[in-house]
Curated annotation (Swiss-Prot):
EC code: 5.4.99.25
Protein name: tRNA pseudouridine synthase B
Catalytic activity annotation: uridine(55) in tRNA = pseudouridine(55) in tRNA
Active site (catalytic residues): D87 (nucleophile)
Range of residues in the leader sequence: none
Amino acid sequence: MTTPDAAIDSKISDSNGADKNKSAADDNAFNAPGRKRHHNNQPRRDKRDVHGWVALDKPVGMTSTQAVAVVKRLFSAKRAGHAGTLDPLASGGLPIALGEATKTVPFVMDGRKRYRFTVAWGEERDTDDTEGRAVATSAERPTAEAIMALLPSFTGKIEQIPPQYSAVKIQGERAYDLARDGEVVPLAPRPVEIHHLNLADHQDSGHSVFEAECGKGTYVRALARDMGRLLGCYGHICALRRTLVGPFDETSMIPLEHLQALCDRAASGEGNLADALLPVETALDDIPALAVTRADAARLHRGQAVLLRGRDAPNMSGTVYVTVAGRLLALAELGNGELIPKRVFNLSGLTASPHRQG
């Protein structure tokens, strides 16, 4: 029977590189998803343990759910989820969590988002984007000066009514389901925070480009709708790109076609899918790290609290992420010299390449 200490030692050794007794062929076999054959002779990939983040640069026209399904299939991952829906109309950052990274999704969802979006003036639509039908029109067009004067009204903590076509729940049903059935249900305003809102371009009177950085729960479509109403000309989103989600910015994003190409190279033994993964702890960017000994790690791994007192006691409290020999072990609460594990990570399987471990 494997002891907790042996289990910890095993997990630590996984993070220190490939087993010296393992051949390159073995590595390539692991990098490429395993395959079996169905009765109809079509290949079937075995599900496997994959842990990390894929900062997908989602293309226009794909839903967030579809994107998760594609990434999950490419990695043959057992578990996957995303950290914040991105409309089909939109492109850009959709962080997808695989395996144990799904335990850190809330930390990303609570982070800031940054968008670059274009508003088409003169028409309000029921979806607040180009996919809907017009519900109000105007021949008026705003000047850059009028727009600039309006921006402070939408900066800071404000109240915002979500779009009719949104995932907000009303008596257990999604607002977009009710809207598709023809029901117009009044939605209550919600507090949101917009940290920055800038007019980036206003080359013609019919369209304006904005950049916004906002907190959790903000709807950019609602922002365009409300600006159009206050300007007296109506408006809707005609282009939208998310450029930041928590710790994931455009420099870390990978286009879907690049991910597919990497998957193809890995299948032929010429690439490593781990190169597309970011470490699980990337999502814990704003949380302090705390290194512990192997003995303490073994206790935490069993779900037991650890006392950290005396001269070497850490001078901090609250939520921390715990590491042992540089390897993520757990999320824990630290207070009064006691470290209590809340989420323990089991990172056996495919993880981010060493050069992406920070």
